């Protein structure tokens, strides 16, 4: 018995141990405007532990995949994150909702981060951000509020490529930067980066 949870679905009341987390179009606004940053994201979880994930970018015709403990791949190429030595060298990305006001935490976070990194990108697709982190195209990423179907596949792909993940609920104590074994269904928040040094640097700026 399999359950499903996704942006286009009503909440699934089933108690199935295996669940598919599906976002059929991550980056909807981009798609509507013809901006080429959108994708399909699919993950399979046993209870709350993600076992496999795939992100397909139809514009670039790229498919990023991962299985827990089996590594991450772009087509047949094994993925590995970059290794920037300093936070100031890092190209990072952020996801936050549209129509934010200047007093919002999203703006505060952005202003806290941007002086300390090489540059910040906002692609409009969380799944693509995580796939690009896994592929070495980005060095870091953060998000405060997001749905599980937006990140379930991407978190696994990034972690299997070597990324360090710090949940935002641990902002007062970064601890060990590793992939949380459980994907929260109540809007997960986290910092992800190419290595622990960059992850903890971003984390500390957000905590400040």
Language-model-derived ranges and their functions:
Residues 135-140, 162-164:
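Alpha-to-beta junction loops
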């Amino acid at each position: 018995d399999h359950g499903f949870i996704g942006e286009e679905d009503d909440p699934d009341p089933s108690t199935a141990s295996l669940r598919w987390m599906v976002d059929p179009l991550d980056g909807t606004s981009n798609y509507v405007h013809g901006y080429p940053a959108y994708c399909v994201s699919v993950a399979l979880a046993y209870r709350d532990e993600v076992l496999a994930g795939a992100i397909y970018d139809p514009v670039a015709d790229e498919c990023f995949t991962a299985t827990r403990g089996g590594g991450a791949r772009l087509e047949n190429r094994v993925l590995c994150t970059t290794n920037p030595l300093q936070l100031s060298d890092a190209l990072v990305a952020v996801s936050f909702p549209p129509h934010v006001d200047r007093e919002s935490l999203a703006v505060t976070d952005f202003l806290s981060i941007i002086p300390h990194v090489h540059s910040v990108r906002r692609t409009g697709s969380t799944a693509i951000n995580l796939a690009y982190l896994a592929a070495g195209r980005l060095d870091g990423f953060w998000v405060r509020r997001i749905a599980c179907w937006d990140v379930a596949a991407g978190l696994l792909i990034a972690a299997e490529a070597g990324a360090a993940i710090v949940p935002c609920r641990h902002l007062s104590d970064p601890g060990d930067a590793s992939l949380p074994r459980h994907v929260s269904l109540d809007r997960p928040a986290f910092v992800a980066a190419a290595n622990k040094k960059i992850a903890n640097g971003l984390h500390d700026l957000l905590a400040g």
